[in-house]
Amino acid sequence: ATAICYFDPVSSPTIVAAEWYRAWGLPASRQAQAAIKGPIAAHLASGRVLPLIDDLVNSGMSVVGVGALEDLREVKAACRDRISILGNLNGIAMTRWTPAEAEIAVKKAIAQAAPGGGFILSDGHGEIPWQVSDEVLHAIVAATRRWGTYPLQAGLADGA
């Protein structure tokens, strides 16, 4: 595998206090990480990650999965040059998107998190609902190819 994703949904500060994660979740994560030979992505099942970025970086994670509720600009600032970002398209909202709305969401995510590298566009939870239309999925792919190729286009600077 290129990387392993370590899903740890209960450790997000959305669900438990960050202190609890540091006391119980982080030691369990480090134990699991020791058995994995290669890059690891931490995914807290679409919960908030910002309060734990330093912990995830210090634990040796290479990538952090970011949920749709997180501000990508804030996460990017906290992660810059230390850990890559995976996310954060809203899979639930995708079920109602038009292709045009899909392009707007992709462009916005890329504008907020891709400059300088270290960003992998994905949904924000680790699975896309089957109710998302093929048309929207194809629009996401097309928009990613259009807006997510380096060097990034100057039109992305405004994030809209």
Put a short name on every predicted segment:
Residues 1-160:
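Active-site loop segments of alpha/beta catalytic cores
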